[in-house]
Regions:
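GH16 jelly-roll
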Residues: 1-268
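Beta-strand-rich interaction surfaces with strong enrichment in secreted/lumenal proteins
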Residues: 77-84, 160-168, 204-205, 309-311, ...
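Extracellular beta-strand ligand-recognition surfaces/modules
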Residues: 105-110, 226, 284, 377-411
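Extracellular carbohydrate recognition and processing domains
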Residues: 133, 358-387
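Extracellular ligand-binding interfaces
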Residues: 337-370
């Protein structure tokens, strides 16, 4: 049994303290816009935190995908980094993963002295990362002993959890992810073991780091789409309830990784904790290259101005939007507002249940007619085990045009 040296515990009951956390503005990797303090929020509102199923406070980390109207913010995430460094021990986080593909939600340790040769590099990194292979039914753990770049030196071991029978990691529930890092080789205990909700996922016995490192939690945009998928969303959020590091008295060398950069997270005060709206450009305000951003199909244009924008959909036309990596058992509330319907037919809005490009079924529909407009809601649950994605459909019958806005969809 390891000897416990000390415990670091953060439940954000005092918000995000800049003396404890660096609110990241760092950028790494290619083809992204880094991380921004503008994307980091917290709530200590007792009622809101309790209603969200958390204790203390909640850290909220935003991410912008490719369907964000402001292209300068696309592929921009958020991260928190401890100023303190830690050695071997058990690292735990209770969080809700950011539920969209194209980004990487991660919990990791990191230190590098910047050495560029095998003789001079000092390095330490252990990762938990998701999704994998464009699926939220897969996640991975990686242990790095040394790393310069993928061409020179990358001493690492990765284990992957492929959990096809479980509900996806993006099910909207709190899950506790953990890894236990041991360096007590003299007693035969050197390695890293990963856990989800207390259940062992895998272990690495090679390439175990030897240096103390800072701890990171957040989301970012890797350039490799075969890894994380395509970020075809507008904005999305991950949530952190608490983080705990139980440090062991195992052998370790001094490393580093905490920085002195200072930025403040935003206190939400009494405002609601922002929720994930799965619809992109649901007010139809963003056009790009003459087409509605995030929507496929013909016959739809953006009308109105300012905050009062809407979709003008011609008669007998259909627009669709894919929402990937959504699985059986997930339940949603879809809502929409019809401003005006002209003609004797209907405007329908519904979800199709997709397995790749094959339609496996569909939800009931929100229906509008010339005499029945306004705002309507629809609850539906994906009921087919093979479903991998949703496709949202907005369509008009022949001879009927529609003005529609405020399409939203939230996980129940």
């Amino acid at each position: 049994e390891p000897t416990i040296k000390g415990t670091f515990y953060e439940d954000f009951s005092n918000g995000i303290d800049s003396d404890i956390w660096e609110v990241s503005s760092q950028k790494w990797g290619a083809d992204n816009n880094g991380t921004s303090p503008d994307n980091v929020f917290y709530s200590t509102d007792e009622t809101r935190v309790k209603n969200a199923g958390a204790t203390g406070g909640i850290a909220v980390l935003r991410s912008y995908g490719d369907l964000q109207a402001n292209s300068a913010k696309r592929r921009q995430g958020a991260a928190l980094i401890t100023r303190q460094t830690f050695g071997p021990g058990k690292y735990e986080v209770r969080m809700k993963v950011l539920p969209r593909l194209g980004q990487c939600t991660a919990f990791w340790t990191y230190y590098s002295n910047g050495g560029q040769t095998p003789e001079t590099i000092k390095y330490s990194e252990i990762d938990i990362e998701m999704p994998m292979e464009g699926s939220f039914k897969k996640w991975s753990g990686t242990s790095y002993e040394r790393f310069i770049d993928w061409n020179i030196l990358a001493d690492r071991q990765t284990v992957m959890a492929d959990e096809p029978e479980k509900g996806g990691l993006n099910d909207g529930q709190w899950h506790t992810y953990a890894f236990e890092w041991r360096t007590d080789a003299a007693n035969g205990d050197r390695g890293v073991i990963w856990y989800r909700d207390g259940e062992k996922m895998g272990e690495a016995r090679e390439f175990v780091p030897n240096y103390k490192a800072a701890l990171w939690v957040g989301n970012w945009f890797p350039p490799d789409k075969s890894w994380v998928g395509i970020p075809d969303f507008e904005e999305a959020y991950m949530y952190v309830d608490w983080i705990r590091v139980t440090e062991y008295d195992d052998p370790v060398q001094e490393g580093g990784g905490g920085s002195t950069a200072r930025a403040e997270a935003t206190d939400l005060g009494t405002k609601p904790i922002p929720q994930n709206d799965y619809i992109s450009n649901g007010k139809f305000s963003s056009m790009e290259n003459g087409v509605l951003l995030g929507w496929e199909g013909e016959g739809g244009t953006s009308s109105g101005s300012g905050s009062d924008t809407y979709l003008n959909l011609e008669a007998g036309k259909k627009l669709t939007q894919m929402i990937r990596a959504q699985y059986s058992g997930y339940s949603f509330t879809l809502s929409a507002e019809a401003l005006k319907i002209v003609g004797s037919g209907k405007c329908k809005i519904y979800a199709e249940y997709m397995f790749g490009s094959v339609r496996m079924g569909k939800s009931e529909a929100i229906e509008f007619t010339a005499s029945d407009t306004g705002k309507k809601n629809l609850n539906f649950t994906i009921d087919n085990n093979r479903v991998t994605d949703l496709r949202i459909v907005v369509e008009t019958e022949e001879g009927t045009t529609a003005q529609v806005t405020n399409i939203e969809m939230f996980l129940n």
